[in-house]
Regions:
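Signature for the C-terminal beta-barrel architecture of outer-membrane proteins
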Residues: 2-191
Length: 193
């Protein structure tokens, strides 16, 4: 954390526990690297950028030291190492504090983007993205400890997936993004007292 900026890097290993991808009786190991850059633009506004990449231990590659790079732009490393070398996503987030009681937040994630397919207007599966819009209302209607939350989430089909199935965003058969994985729309309404 420095000034109004917070920067986080994480690296870890994951397991693909599907029987069809075992290697010598052991579950397949894959790795993930993440960057998250958050900036408090003002006392009310926070914006963030993030990226993540998953890769496998193909050809005894192991943990790829290229992904120790502390600077954002994993997509360039993924491109340099080959199409099936990894699965990268990028995204942005924002949070705005209207007052002490009301916050709005959003997030956008981009897995794959094809401008030609957007121009064609055919709703191509190649454009894989998701977004979230939400708001929280603390001490709602001046009732102490009453919190109300409304959130809309939408993720296009095949987001977080890859041509090489082992490069999907999952660990121990659980989605790492949303319980429903991809291809969904949901409205979440929460009230707590």
């Amino acid at each position: 954390k420095f000034w109004k900026i917070q920067y986080t890097n994480t690296w870890t290993w994951l397991r693909d526990v599907r029987p069809e991808v075992t290697v010598d009786g052991a579950f397949l190991t894959k790795y993930i690297a993440n960057h998250y850059l958050s900036w408090n633009v003002s006392k009310r506004l926070n914006v963030g950028l993030f990226e993540s990449v998953i890769w496998t231990n193909s050809n005894d590659r192991g943990f790829d030291v290229n992904y120790l790079n502390p600077v954002i732009f994993y997509r360039a490393i993924e491109f340099e190492t080959g199409q099936d070398a990894g699965n990268a996503i990028v995204g942005a987030s924002a949070k705005y504090k209207f007052n002490d009681n009301i916050n709005a937040y959003s997030q956008f994630v981009l897995d794959e983007f094809s401008l030609n397919d957007i121009k064609a207007g055919n709703k191509s599966y190649k454009n894989k993205f998701g977004f979230q819009l939400g708001a929280k209302y603390y001490n709602a209607f001046k009732v102490k400890n009453l919190m109300l939350q409304a959130e809309y989430n939408q993720v296009r089909p095949y987001a977080y997936s890859h041509n090489s199935i082992v490069l999907n965003y999952a660990h121990n058969n659980q989605s790492m993004a949303h319980l429903w994985g991809a291809n969904f729309r949901e409205l979440v309404l929460i009230g707590r007292y």
